[in-house]
């Protein structure tokens, strides 16, 4: 059995309600999804043992139920109703029991959600494969670290630094890194992605990854300013965010694709490419949850 299919079989066992749609997305994008899932399965089993794939499937199911519940609350309230930032920090980002299943789901959705699969295609084909040779790359809010590890797997010439505010997330990233074979080129650290007033933050990078971070911030504008400050003249940015897609820790509500686009361009970079795909919604819904990704370049 191929490594990618281990996840699909685990969903059949542990996340039956969500398995058919995940399999349909995988089958429609087999090569691309396998590019993500094959190394992920190897790293997961090498790190966490033979139960890792089933644990990931359970985490995915828990995440999907949570998203559905949050979207129902959003429909009733007419706006995001997140917890306070201190509650999010303690109950999500610093709570290992919550963060570990959350982190598994946060990477599996790229292969199993129709609204996310084009993100991983853009990430690979229009970001990673277009970076300058020997590029240095910074990932903001790296979480599980898998995007950085996939970058290292795809581009053996690049160096990557990943930062995240969540200690459990960075612990996961470092454990996966230890078995990935990329320890000489990838580093993860606990750090606020928006801390730009420190000497190390003056360094510029040829590649910056900011995947699904903006919606977690009270105000995303400083994020775009930080990206602009750190991007080298020849650099590329992979940026993504959620639109009308409520979750427990989604704080900033985007309603239109033009909103993050305008924020990016107001900070300086040019948007050279944008994709946005919607999730399936119930008839009569007020909101259409979407996932939007952009490639940014220096002007």
Question: Where are the regions a protein language model picked out?
Answer:
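Conserved SAM-binding strand-loop segment of SAM-dependent methyltransferases
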Residues: 182-194
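Conserved SAM/SAH-binding beta-strand->alpha-helix loop
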Residues: 166-168
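A short glycine-rich, Lys/Arg-flanked "PGG" loop and its adjoining helix->strand segment in the class I
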Residues: 222-233
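Conserved beta-strand signature within the Rossmann-like core of class I S-adenosyl-L-methionine
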Residues: 235-242
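Conserved SAM-binding loop of SAM-dependent methyltransferases across substrates and taxa
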Residues: 144-156
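A short acidic, Gly/Pro-enriched loop at the edge of an enzyme's catalytic core
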Residues: 194, 198-208
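N-terminal auxiliary segments of SAM/dcSAM-dependent transferases
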Residues: 4-92
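Conserved alpha-helix/loop element of class I SAM-dependent methyltransferases that forms part
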Residues: 101, 114-133
């Amino acid at each position: 059995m191929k490594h990618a299919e281990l996840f699909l079989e685990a969903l059949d066992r542990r996340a039956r309600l969500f398995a058919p749609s995940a399999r349909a997305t995988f089958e429609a994008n087999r090569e691309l999804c396998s590019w993500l899932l094959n190394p992920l399965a190897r790293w997961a089993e090498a790190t966490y043992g033979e139960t890792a794939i089933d644990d990931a499937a359970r985490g995915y199911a828990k995440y999907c139920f949570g998203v559905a519940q949050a979207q129902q609350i959003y429909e009733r309230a007419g706006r995001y109703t997140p917890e306070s930032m201190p509650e999010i920090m303690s109950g999500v980002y610093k709570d290992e029991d919550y963060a570990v299943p959350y982190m598994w789901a946060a990477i599996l959705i790229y292969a199993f959600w129709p609204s996310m699969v084009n993100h991983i295609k853009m990430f690979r084909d229009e970001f990673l494969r277009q970076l300058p040779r020997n590029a240095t790359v910074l990932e903001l809010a790296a979480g599980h670290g898998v995007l950085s590890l996939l970058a290292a797997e795809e581009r053996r010439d690049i160096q990557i630094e990943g930062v995240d505010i969540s200690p459990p997330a960075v612990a996961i990233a470092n454990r996966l890194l230890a078995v990935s074979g990329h320890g000489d080129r990838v580093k993860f650290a606990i750090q606020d992605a928006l801390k730009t007033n420190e000497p190390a933050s003056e360094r510029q990078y040829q590649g910056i990854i900011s995947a699904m971070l903006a919606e977690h911030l009270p105000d995303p504008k400083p994020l775009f300013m930080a990206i602009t400050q750190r991007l080298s003249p020849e650099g590329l940015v992979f940026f993504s965010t959620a639109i009308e897609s409520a979750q427990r820790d989604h704080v900033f509500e985007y309603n239109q694709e033009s909103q993050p686009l305008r924020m990016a361009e107001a900070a300086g970079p040019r948007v050279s490419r944008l994709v946005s795909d919607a999730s399936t919604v119930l008839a009569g819904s007020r909101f259409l949850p979407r996932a939007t990704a952009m490639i940014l370049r220096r002007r």
